[in-house]
Amino acid sequence: MARAALVIRQEGPSQPDVIELLRHGEAFSARLYPPESNHHLPLDALRRPEVRFLVARDAEGKALATGAVVLHGGWAEIKRMWVEEATRGRGIARQILNALMAEAGGAGVEMLRLETGVANHGALALYEKTGFKRREPFADYRPDPLSVFMERPLQRRPSLERGRRLCQ
């Protein structure tokens, strides 16, 4: 598996190519789960100050992946993690996940949590390989047979400013 040459940065979610990528993720989830089991963070919420929204772009600047960390004090939640289907298998998901973990650790987060779907086998495998363990629902989530809730501890790391490269 060749590792993609990427630039991962904090960006706003308003660029047309990023909006298109987010919509692809929503369409993918809609094919797998009913609306009540889809928990996408709305586009407007990605602009809030407690959200760190990252975009992975290739050497030509094409948006290939997104991910967000929503800060909640000592813990954070991963949201909107999506890799364009045509670019999967190149290590992009792991790179953006590592960047999200670094961003959360830099913000002082000690526990990182997420919710994903039971049919999202690639995501589940990645999260398990990177140390996430299954747990009960958290925050406002309710038990859902189509959802998997996970968490992993983090070490605090230096944070990066908006627009700076997180991975190259």
Locate each region found by the language model.
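Acetyl-CoA-dependent GNAT
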Residues: 3-79, 84-86, 97-98, 103, ...
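Conserved catalytic-core motifs of GNAT/GCN5-like acyltransferases
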Residues: 13, 113-116, 124, 128, ...
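Active-site acidic-Proline motif in GNAT/NAT acetyltransferases
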Residues: 84-90, 118-119
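Conserved GNAT acetyl-CoA-binding A-motif
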Residues: 97, 104-115
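A generic structural signal for beta-strand entry/edge sites
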Residues: 73-75, 111, 147
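Cationic, low-complexity basic patches in intrinsically disordered or flexible, solvent-exposed regions
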Residues: 162
